[in-house]
């Protein structure tokens, strides 16, 4: 079912009542007013009035004067307030994973697909600590080196959790974990034909990035440097060119080591940053998660504000007139 809500098209699995829709959107029905196809829906009727395919809805609330300056970003028709995406691996335990994700403010978390431990099926799983009802799970193909393995993995992920929004990564070798672009292109084509919405890990090559966008990928995720290296963004110029070349969201994926790396990615104009090791392997992962949250926000504000032009000469801050 397709709905247009506040001017944006959104997809839902089935028809539902206004009350159920607000619940799925995480909106408190007591604090909003709803208009459906230009007709106001009385609050007393939220549980009875159905929304159907093609309906147009406006959901409004009171604000404290002026416009809402929330700086969200949208991928595959879904809107998120946090531009920080985090991985769930490499932590000492699931409890630390959950605490770090909470501190980061992230709404999207990547999850790898692995076989169930049949020798101990009662062993705790990630979903026991990090709920897919609270966060958007982004299944990925970490550890896959061929297009066929990647496609197979994501089909299993969709069967397990019903997720169509996925992160594709096809690795070239175990030493660099650099993206294998021919296999990535092959896998992306197959997944898109199969109805997946593909966010794709790729090289920092603007030509390849444009090819992936033209195929139908919903987000381009060039590496800043090698996965887990912490080397930061080695080629900021190519990242900027990719951002200028494609229209879909661009998120730096891999290589971030500290908060300044995350801020730089955002200052380049990127729509977001995905990281895992930088938080999980910090001496204090919870504190680093908070640092990354603030770095993303600071870098984004800096980009929106616009930096001063660089000069090759001095320009005094104080006025020169009236000197004694």
UniProtKB/Swiss-Prot annotation:
Enzyme nomenclature, EC number: 2.8.1.10
Short name of any one Pfam family annotated for the protein: ThiS
Entry annotation: catalytic residues: 167 (schiff-base intermediate with dxp)
Cellular location(s): Cytoplasm
GO MF annotations in UniProt: thiazole synthase activity
GO term, biological process aspect, one: thiamine diphosphate biosynthetic process
Keywords: Cytoplasm, Schiff base, Thiamine biosynthesis, Transferase
Domain of life: Bacteria
SUBUNIT field: Homotetramer. Forms heterodimers with either ThiH or ThiS.
Protein name: Thiazole synthase
Gene: thiG
